[in-house]
Design a protein with these regions (language model features):
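Short loop/turn segments at secondary-structure transitions that flank enzyme active sites
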Residues: 8-10, 51-53, 73, 91-93, ...
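GHKL-type ATPase core
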Residues: 1-93
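A broadly used, surface-exposed interaction patch
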Residues: 18-25, 91-129
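Short aromatic-centered micro-motifs
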Residues: 85, 108, 134
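A general structural signal for short secondary-structure junctions and capping/turn motifs
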Residues: 1, 34-38, 74-77, 107-110, ...
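Short, low-complexity, polar/charged sequence segments that are solvent-exposed and flexible
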Residues: 21-26, 37, 63-68, 104-106, ...
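GHKL/Bergerat-fold ATPase module
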Residues: 114-233
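Amphipathic alpha-helical surface "interface" segments used
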Residues: 84-96, 222-233
Length: 233
C-alpha cells in the first residue's frame, strides 16, 4: 500500500487530504475529503505491505541517488522557499549533484515580461545535460530545448531553467523560434512579437552560459597548474 498525506495552502488556509493506493488495484486510488489543518504544507509518502521489499530496499542509501537525479534541480530552484525532500527523516542534499558555486541565477525583463534564468552546473554528467527547460510561474515545465553547448568537450555539464509567465499557454517553444504553439488563434503580429522575445531570451541565456563557461575553464586551468606543480615538488 502507498499513502500520500498532503497539506496544501489555499486562500482560506491550509487543508489536508490523503491519497491511498492499494496493492490489489494499482489503477484506482482513494482520495479523502480535504479538511482544515494548522500543519505546514508538504507531502509525506508511506509505503507498506509490499511483498518482496524489505526496509533496506527503501533506505536512504538505496534511494538517495535515484531521488537526487530526479529532483536535485527542483530542490535548487525552490531553495528560497525552503522546500526539502526527506527519506525516512534524512534530508536530501542537492549539492551532491549541483555545483552551487558555478551555478548562476539572473532575473531580466524583455518587453516588460519578467524572466528568471537559472543555469545549473552539474558535478558530473547526467542524462539531461545541455537542456533548456521553460517553466510557467507555477513551476510547470511547458517546453524543452537544447543549448548551443550540447556538443562541448570541456566537461561543462549544465542545464538551464527559465521561469516566466510568458510560457503559460505557449507549448513547444524553441529558442530558434521555429515552433511556437499558442492557445487558440494567434495573430501574425503577436507571433512576430513572440519571436522577438525568444530571440532576446536566447541571447541572454547564451551570455549566462558563456560567462559561466569561461569561469569553469579558468578554474580547470588553475587545477591543472596546481597538479603539475604538485608533481614537480
Amino acid at each position: 500500500m502507498a499513502e500520500w498525506s498532503t497539506v496544501t495552502a489555499t486562500p482560506d488556509g491550509n487543508i489536508a487530504y490523503t491519497i491511498s493506493l492499494e496493492n490489489a488495484d494499482k489503477n484506482q486510488c482513494d482520495v479523502s475529503d480535504p479538511a482544515p489543518t494548522t500543519r505546514s504544507t508538504g507531502t509525506r509518502l508511506i509505503i507498506s505491505g509490499i511483498d518482496g521489499i524489505c526496509e533496506d530496499d527503501v533506505s536512504f542509501a538505496q534511494l538517495e541517488d535515484t531521488m537526487l537525479k530526479a529532483f536535485a534541480w527542483y530542490l535548487y530552484l525552490n531553495k528560497d522557499k525552503k522546500i526539502v525532500l526527506t527519506i525516512n527523516g534524512t534530508e536530501l542534499d542537492y549539492r551532491k549533484y549541483i555545483n552551487t558555486d558555478a551555478s548562476v541565477e539572473k532575473e531580466i525583463l524583455i518587453s516588460r515580461i519578467p524572466f528568471k534564468i537559472a543555469l545549473i552546473v552539474w558535478n558530473e554528467k547526467i542524462t539531461e545535460n545541455f537542456s533548456v527547460y521553460f517553466l510557467d510561474e507555477e513551476g510547470v515545465v511547458r517546453s524543452k530545448d537544447t543549448t548551443t553547448f550540447n556538443r562541448n568537450t570541456v566537461n561543462f555539464n549544465h542545464s538551464v531553467f527559465v521561469t516566466s509567465p510568458f510560457f503559460l499557454g505557449r507549448d513547444g517553444i524553441t529558442l530558434k523560434g521555429k515552433r511556437v504553439e499558442l492557445d487558440g488563434q494567434t495573430a501574425l503580429n503577436e507571433y512576430d512579437e513572440d519571436k522577438k522575445v525568444l530571440k532576446e531570451l536566447s541571447k541572454e541565456i547564451q551570455d549566462v552560459i558563456e560567462e559561466s563557461l569561461h569561469k569553469h575553464m579558468a578554474a580547470q586551468v588553475d587545477k591543472a597548474i596546481a597538479r603539475m606543480e604538485a608533481r614537480d615538488s
